[in-house]
Amino acid sequence: MAINAQEISALIKQQIENFQPDFDVTETGVVTYVGDGIARAHGLDNAMSGELLVFENGSYGMAQNLESNDVGIIILGDFTDIREGDTIRRTGKIMEVPVGEALIGRVVDPLGRPVDGLGEIATDKTRPVETPAPGVMQRKSVSEPLQTGLKAIDALVPIGRGQRELIIGDRQTGKTTIAIDAILNQKGQDMICIYVAIGQKESTVRTQVETLRQYGALDYTIVVTASASQPSPLLYLAPYAGVAMAEEFMYNGKHVLIVYDDLSKQAVAYRELSLLLRRPPGREAFPGDVFYLHSRLLERSAKVSDELGGGSITALPFIETQAGDISAYIATNVISITDGQIFLSDGLFNGGVRPAIDAGSSVSRVGGSAQIKAMKKVAGTLRIDLASYRELEAFTKFGSDLDAATQAKLNRGRRTVEVLKQPVHKPLPVEKQVVILYALTHGFLDSVPVDDILRFEEELFAYFDAHQEGIYETIRTTKDLPSEEVLDAAITEFVNQSSFK
């Protein structure tokens, strides 16, 4: 076969003309330091703040400090096999997490990866973890109630959909129990719940997940967990990942309840990162922007306008106090950001008052306008009565003689405290709360011994379930009380045929 030189040169020319170079230009740098969840890299001159970076071994990092000679990076995940001298490249993207219906019922880490052993999550939708909060004109005022199922909260410090209500108290005072009960009570309320566990033991998170599964609440709940054994960057990111998942539902017209358990541990993780990145420390060694850390998170909870879907995110952030000190730095920061706080008292908890809500220190700044009419009527004076009872109780310790009016106030106060107690994981529908609080405020419990209040409550509910279902139905549908004559007659009838005469 003869080789034609002209043909060969024509073929080569054709190949050269048709050649399409396929190469990807990315800016790369070199890792100059790595340790304790952070790295420094030289050569990433155009990196953006918050940009996602990829290490040589496939791990991800996030640019935090942009300095003149290098970039401070937080490492998202395991950093043990990253070495000095490794290459690192920019992605040009900011961090996003998977979102959507596929996450419901799953337990995920802050990067959206499943940790429950139930396989991959089938969703192709993502949202950035950091997005601007809705503006003033994009919001609506809080007008719908969020029923927690706890008498002490729904009556004294009511929460509305779109509100941020801080739950603050020492360790072991029942903070998590309140949040879990609130999640359980959303069954059938068309709410999606997100429980963000920050810096907790994995065994504790497992217990909470099993509780949710046992009561059928995992069918509408997403659990985001960054356990105590994970690196600080994941603890810092967990709440932002949780609220990004919530925003997907909110902007599609749904209502979400998100629980941050707890933000004290997130602040500690952020302090650790900031000190490792050599940022100047401020009060209690926290960096100067620790207020912004929480404000930009909690401002993303809102009830948005109808143009944006009319959905809402209700936030229950937790703060753990030391020896009941609510004037600590992080505590006062979050109190000033939120729309009210529920203060759980160590003394009340140890005295058997559970939930241990201190009515004097707790307040809801917007939830009152979201209460249903029936609850407003029966719970109107409850807070003041309870506060004056606590005051009187302190005076009675001096042993002075009491007049009849004071004695009556004390008796009513003791019964109020008893009625507001509630066993764990037994949230009450609002119509039952209204009935027992009506019985309390209208004097039906004044002659019942304090030790029998719980039994009275159970038997009253059983009697109403059997004979007075119409009253429950009226409260449910009209959101208002039936006429006083009807309620008085029904409760009197129960008292007459019971052993509480």
Swiss-Prot record:
InterPro entries: ATP_synth_asu-like_sf, ATP_synth_asu_C, ATP_synth_asu_C_sf, ATP_synth_F1_a_nt-bd_dom, ATP_synth_F1_asu, ATPase_F1/V1/A1_a/bsu_N, ATPase_F1/V1/A1_a/bsu_N_sf, ATPase_F1/V1/A1_a/bsu_nucl-bd. It is a peripheral membrane protein. GO terms for cellular component: plasma membrane; proton-transporting ATP synthase complex. ATP binds at G169, D170, R171, Q172, T173, G174, K175, T176. It is found in: Cell membrane. The keyword Membrane applies. Its EC number is 7.1.2.2. Its main location: membrane. It comes from the Bacteria. The keyword Nucleotide-binding applies. Pfam families: ATP-synt_ab (PF00006), ATP-synt_ab_C (PF00306), ATP-synt_ab_N (PF02874). It catalyses: ATP + H2O + 4 H(+)(in) = ADP + phosphate + 5 H(+)(out). Keywords: ATP synthesis, ATP-binding, Cell membrane, CF(1), Hydrogen ion transport, Ion transport, Membrane, Nucleotide-binding, Translocase, Transport. F-type ATPases have 2 components, CF(1) - the catalytic core - and CF(0) - the membrane proton channel. CF(1) has five subunits: alpha(3), beta(3), gamma(1), delta(1), epsilon(1). CF(0) has three main subunits: a(1), b(2) and c(9-12). The alpha and beta chains form an alternating ring which encloses part of the gamma chain. CF(1) is attached to CF(0) by a central stalk formed by the gamma and epsilon chains, while a peripheral stalk is formed by the delta and b chains. Belongs to the ATPase alpha/beta chains family. This is ATP synthase subunit alpha.
